[in-house]
Protein backbone atom coordinates (compact mmCIF):
# COMPACT_ATOMS: atom_id res chain seq x y z
CA UNK A 1 0.00 0.00 0.00
CA UNK A 2 1.47 3.34 -1.05
CA UNK A 3 0.88 6.19 1.37
CA UNK A 4 2.12 9.68 2.20
CA UNK A 5 1.54 9.43 5.94
CA UNK A 6 0.67 6.73 8.46
CA UNK A 7 0.14 6.13 12.15
CA UNK A 8 -0.14 3.12 14.45
CA UNK A 9 -1.78 2.88 17.86
CA UNK A 10 -1.90 -0.04 20.31
CA UNK A 11 -4.19 -0.13 23.32
CA UNK A 12 -5.93 -2.56 25.66
CA UNK A 13 -9.36 -3.89 24.73
CA UNK A 14 -11.18 -1.88 27.38
CA UNK A 15 -14.39 -0.04 26.55
CA UNK A 16 -12.90 3.14 28.06
CA UNK A 17 -10.37 3.19 25.19
CA UNK A 18 -12.98 3.21 22.41
CA UNK A 19 -13.50 7.00 22.49
CA UNK A 20 -9.73 7.54 22.74
CA UNK A 21 -9.18 5.43 19.62
CA UNK A 22 -11.77 7.24 17.52
CA UNK A 23 -10.45 10.64 18.63
CA UNK A 24 -6.87 9.72 17.65
CA UNK A 25 -7.98 8.52 14.21
CA UNK A 26 -10.13 11.64 13.70
CA UNK A 27 -7.17 13.86 14.62
CA UNK A 28 -4.98 11.99 12.12
CA UNK A 29 -7.67 12.29 9.41
CA UNK A 30 -7.93 16.05 10.02
CA UNK A 31 -4.90 16.67 7.78
CA UNK A 32 -7.15 15.81 4.80
CA UNK A 33 -9.45 18.73 5.72
CA UNK A 34 -12.61 16.61 5.97
CA UNK A 35 -16.06 18.01 6.58
CA UNK A 36 -17.63 17.61 10.02
CA UNK A 37 -19.83 14.88 8.52
CA UNK A 38 -16.83 12.98 7.13
CA UNK A 39 -15.09 13.13 10.53
CA UNK A 40 -18.27 11.91 12.23
CA UNK A 41 -18.49 9.01 9.74
CA UNK A 42 -14.89 7.99 10.45
CA UNK A 43 -15.35 8.23 14.23
CA UNK A 44 -18.55 6.16 14.10
CA UNK A 45 -16.96 3.43 11.97
CA UNK A 46 -13.85 3.25 14.19
CA UNK A 47 -16.06 3.04 17.29
CA UNK A 48 -17.97 0.11 15.80
CA UNK A 49 -14.81 -1.73 14.77
CA UNK A 50 -13.17 -1.26 18.18
CA UNK A 51 -16.36 -2.31 19.98
CA UNK A 52 -16.48 -5.48 17.84
CA UNK A 53 -12.90 -6.29 18.93
CA UNK A 54 -13.79 -5.84 22.60
CA UNK A 55 -17.12 -7.69 22.62
CA UNK A 56 -16.63 -10.36 19.96
CA UNK A 57 -12.89 -10.71 19.37
CA UNK A 58 -11.79 -10.77 22.98
CA UNK A 59 -15.22 -11.52 24.51
CA UNK A 60 -14.69 -8.77 27.11
CA UNK A 61 -11.31 -10.19 28.16
CA UNK A 62 -8.19 -8.05 27.92
CA UNK A 63 -6.12 -8.16 24.74
CA UNK A 64 -4.36 -5.72 22.44
CA UNK A 65 -6.14 -3.79 19.70
CA UNK A 66 -4.02 -2.20 16.99
CA UNK A 67 -5.18 0.61 14.75
CA UNK A 68 -3.19 1.58 11.69
CA UNK A 69 -4.20 4.48 9.47
CA UNK A 70 -2.74 5.39 6.10
CA UNK A 71 -3.24 8.53 4.02
CA UNK A 72 -2.82 8.47 0.27
CA UNK A 73 -4.10 11.35 -1.83
CA UNK A 74 -7.60 12.18 -0.61
CA UNK A 75 -8.27 8.85 1.08
CA UNK A 76 -7.70 7.43 4.53
CA UNK A 77 -7.50 3.69 5.08
CA UNK A 78 -7.97 2.47 8.64
CA UNK A 79 -7.14 -1.02 9.87
CA UNK A 80 -8.49 -2.24 13.21
CA UNK A 81 -6.79 -5.46 14.27
CA UNK A 82 -7.29 -7.87 17.15
CA UNK A 83 -5.74 -11.21 18.03
CA UNK A 84 -8.96 -12.56 19.46
CA UNK A 85 -11.11 -15.54 18.55
CA UNK A 86 -11.68 -14.61 14.91
CA UNK A 87 -14.82 -14.92 12.80
CA UNK A 88 -15.95 -18.35 11.59
CA UNK A 89 -18.13 -17.10 8.71
CA UNK A 90 -17.36 -13.53 7.60
CA UNK A 91 -20.14 -13.43 4.99
CA UNK A 92 -22.74 -14.42 7.58
CA UNK A 93 -21.30 -12.03 10.20
CA UNK A 94 -21.65 -9.13 7.76
CA UNK A 95 -25.38 -9.67 7.22
CA UNK A 96 -27.52 -6.98 8.88
CA UNK A 97 -28.90 -8.08 12.25
CA UNK A 98 -26.73 -11.22 12.45
CA UNK A 99 -25.36 -11.51 15.96
CA UNK A 100 -23.91 -14.00 18.36
CA UNK A 101 -24.98 -11.72 21.24
CA UNK A 102 -28.76 -11.36 21.22
CA UNK A 103 -28.74 -9.60 24.59
CA UNK A 104 -26.67 -6.65 23.32
CA UNK A 105 -28.30 -3.36 22.35
CA UNK A 106 -27.95 -2.68 18.57
CA UNK A 107 -26.76 -6.27 18.16
CA UNK A 108 -25.88 -7.26 14.63
CA UNK A 109 -25.43 -3.77 13.22
CA UNK A 110 -21.66 -3.19 13.56
CA UNK A 111 -20.58 -4.16 10.04
CA UNK A 112 -23.70 -2.54 8.56
CA UNK A 113 -22.79 0.74 10.28
CA UNK A 114 -19.19 0.50 9.03
CA UNK A 115 -20.39 -0.16 5.46
CA UNK A 116 -22.81 2.76 5.66
CA UNK A 117 -20.31 5.33 6.89
CA UNK A 118 -17.20 4.27 4.96
CA UNK A 119 -16.65 3.94 1.21
CA UNK A 120 -14.97 0.52 1.35
CA UNK A 121 -14.93 -2.27 3.93
CA UNK A 122 -12.89 -5.47 3.92
CA UNK A 123 -12.71 -8.09 6.65
CA UNK A 124 -10.00 -10.73 7.03
CA UNK A 125 -10.19 -13.26 9.83
CA UNK A 126 -8.71 -16.54 10.95
CA UNK A 127 -10.60 -18.43 13.67
CA UNK A 128 -8.45 -18.64 16.79
CA UNK A 129 -6.01 -15.99 15.52
CA UNK A 130 -7.91 -12.73 15.11
CA UNK A 131 -9.52 -10.28 12.75
CA UNK A 132 -8.49 -7.33 10.60
CA UNK A 133 -11.13 -4.81 9.53
CA UNK A 134 -9.95 -2.46 6.77
CA UNK A 135 -12.08 0.62 6.08
CA UNK A 136 -11.46 3.32 3.49
CA UNK A 137 -12.99 6.79 3.30
CA UNK A 138 -12.49 9.18 0.38
CA UNK A 139 -12.44 12.78 1.59
CA UNK A 140 -14.08 15.27 -0.74
CA UNK A 141 -15.81 14.39 -3.97
CA UNK A 142 -13.11 12.59 -5.99
CA UNK A 143 -13.27 8.87 -5.35
UniProtKB/Swiss-Prot annotation:
GO biological process, one term: sporulation resulting in formation of a cellular spore
Keywords of this entry: ATP-binding, Kinase, Nucleotide-binding, Serine/threonine-protein kinase, Sporulation, Transferase
Signal peptide: none
EC primary class: transferase
The keyword Transferase is assigned to this record: yes
Annotated EC: 2.7.11.1
InterPro entries: Anti-sigma-factor_SerPK, Anti-sigma_F, HATPase_C_sf
Protein's UniProt name: Anti-sigma F factor
Organism encoding this protein: Thermoanaerobacter pseudethanolicus (strain ATCC 33223 / 39E) (Clostridium thermohydrosulfuricum)
Gene name of the encoded protein: spoIIAB
Amino acid sequence: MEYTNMMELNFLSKSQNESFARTVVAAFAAQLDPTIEEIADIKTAVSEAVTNCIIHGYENKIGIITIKAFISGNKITIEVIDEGKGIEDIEKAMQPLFTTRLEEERAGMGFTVMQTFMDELEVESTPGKGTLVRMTKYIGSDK
